[in-house]
Each structure stands twice: as structure tokens, then as C-alpha cells.
């Protein structure tokens, strides 16, 4: 497999075509942004940590019967992925009220959400990622009712798997964002699941363990990302390595 040309550059990743039309190369860059790109920096090693965590989570999901676009790790910060037809939806599962849902609705910061809330936004920079309901999704032709039902079921299954996994490592999965695509008639998890797309709190202290550290200047971003990666990639506390 040989890298051919650049297909897409996002805020923190670049995607390349290869000589195999079914396979893309995804490179996690060291760029970090917040507030729709108004705040941006480059932090050496950040891309590697996100790639390691995403790779681990994708493999974990595959082991539990959830299809993802992940194929293989190529080198540090670089993975091979399936060529999906992406669905322009950002699917957010919220277990605890935090962030925009507290700013926009009468929830209290830290309020448990049981059952978890699924919020779906239209992935569109031009329209500033507005929230969608099912009817808007159908009217815009973004997904069929059957596809949306499957996406929601997968999102809740992933949430349960990751919440339990992280809980054993002393981390609360507050909320997280996923993207999905179509591959050979199947709905498949795409993009990434990392500290950039999850909101994580330390169970004991409530300390932020995600990109909020960068957004709001809460501490050393790289120290935080390195620590979270170590906890996610290690056995649960009390178990031998």
C-alpha cells in the first residue's frame, strides 16, 4: 500500500488516498484548536497520543462486535482506515451534563443524565454544526430511519462499553462525539475517538482529562494527554500488567 495524494485536511488530522481505493491513510497531527479555530497551537506528541488511544478503542470495539474503519497502525501517529462514505452527522452521547448542554439548557454542571442523552449535530462548518432532530435528518437526506436507528443503537452500545472500561481506570466518561459512515452496506464507526473527542473527568477529583484543559487553560495539556493515554492503555488498577 502506497500513499498517493492528500484527500482532506481537518483541524487535527490529514487523510490521504492510497494506491488501494478501499484504503486511506489517516495522520494525526500535533495541532490543537478550540472555539471554532479561534484558539490554536501545535503541541509536539499530541497526535501520537490521540492515535494510540483511537487505535486501542477501535480495536476494543471490534473485539466486541462493533465495526470501525480501523485497519492497521502504520507508524507513530499514522493509521490505515477503510474508505467510508461518511455521514455528515456528529453523534454525541452525554452521560453527565457539561459544556454546551449546560449553557443552552437548564441542566446543572455535573448532573447525571440517566438514561444517557444522544444529541446529533449537522457536521457543517458553513452552518456552524447546528443540532438536528430525526425529521430534519430525514428531510435533508442525511440518513434513512433504519440507518439512524442503527447509529443510535451503536452509539449507546459504544457508550456502555467505554463507560465501563474507563470507570475501571478511574475515569468518568462525561460525553463523547462519534462519526459514522457507510461501507459495503454497513454502518461503520469512523473518524477518531480520543481525548480530542471525549470529555473525561477524574473520578476522584473531577479534574478535566481532555481538550478542556487546553480550551480553558486548566493545566499542562501534554502531561494530561500522556497520563490519560497511559491509563487507557494499561490494565485496570489492581490488576497485573
Curated annotation (Swiss-Prot):
One of its GO terms (biological process) is 'de novo' IMP biosynthetic process. Keywords: ATP-binding, Ligase, Nucleotide-binding, Purine biosynthesis. Its EC number is 6.3.2.6. It catalyses: 5-amino-1-(5-phospho-D-ribosyl)imidazole-4-carboxylate + L-aspartate + ATP = (2S)-2-[5-amino-1-(5-phospho-beta-D-ribosyl)imidazole-4-carboxamido]succinate + ADP + phosphate + 2 H(+). SUPFAM superfamilies: SAICAR synthase-like. Pathway: Purine metabolism; IMP biosynthesis via de novo pathway; 5-amino-1-(5-phospho-D-ribosyl)imidazole-4-carboxamide from 5-amino-1-(5-phospho-D-ribosyl)imidazole-4-carboxylate: step 1/2. InterPro entries: SAICAR_synt/ADE2_N, SAICAR_synt_PurC, SAICAR_synth, SAICAR_synthetase, SAICAR_synthetase_CS. Pfam families: SAICAR_synt (PF01259). One of its GO terms (molecular function) is ATP binding. The keyword Cell inner membrane does not apply. The keyword Hydrolase does not apply. HAMAP family: SAICAR_synth (MF_00137). Belongs to the SAICAR synthetase family. This is Phosphoribosylaminoimidazole-succinocarboxamide synthase. It comes from Methanoculleus marisnigri (strain ATCC 35101 / DSM 1498 / JR1).
Amino acid at each position: 500500500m502506497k500513499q498517493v495524494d492528500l484527500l482532506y485536511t481537518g483541524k487535527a488530522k490529514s487523510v490521504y488516498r492510497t494506491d488501494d481505493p478501499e484504503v486511506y491513510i489517516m495522520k494525526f497531527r500535533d495541532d490543537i484548536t478550540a472555539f471554532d479555530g479561534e484558539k490554536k497551537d501545535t503541541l509536539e506528541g499530541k497526535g501520537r497520543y490521540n492515535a494510540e488511544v483511537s487505535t486501542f478503542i477501535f480495536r476494543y470495539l471490534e473485539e466486541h462486535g462493533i465495526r470501525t474503519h480501523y485497519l492497521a497502525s502504520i507508524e507513530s501517529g499514522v493509521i490505515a482506515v477503510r474508505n467510508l462514505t461518511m455521514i455528515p452527522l456528529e453523534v454525541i452521547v452525554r452521560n453527565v451534563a457539561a459544556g454546551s448542554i449546560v449553557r443552552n439548557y437548564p441542566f446543572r454542571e455535573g448532573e447525571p443524565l440517566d438514561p444517557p442523552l444522544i444529541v446529533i449535530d449537522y457536521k457543517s462548518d458553513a452552518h456552524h454544526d447546528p443540532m438536528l432532530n430525526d425529521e430534519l435528518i430525514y428531510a435533508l437526506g442525511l440518513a434513512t430511519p433504519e440507518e439512524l436507528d442503527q447509529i443510535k443503537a451503536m452509539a449507546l452500545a459504544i457508550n456502555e462499553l467505554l463507560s465501563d472500561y474507563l470507570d475501571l481506570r478511574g475515569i468518568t466518561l462525561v460525553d463523547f462525539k462519534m462519526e459514522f459512515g457507510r461501507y459495503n452496506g454497513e454502518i461503520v464507526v469512523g473518524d477518531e475517538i480520543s481525548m480530542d473527542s471525549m470529555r473525561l473527568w477524574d473520578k476522584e477529583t473531577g479534574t478535566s482529562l481532555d481538550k478542556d484543559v487546553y480550551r480553558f487553560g486548566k493545566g499542562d495539556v501534554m502531561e494530561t494527554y500522556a497520563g490519560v493515554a497511559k491509563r487507557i492503555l494499561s490494565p485496570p488498577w489492581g490488576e497485573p500488567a
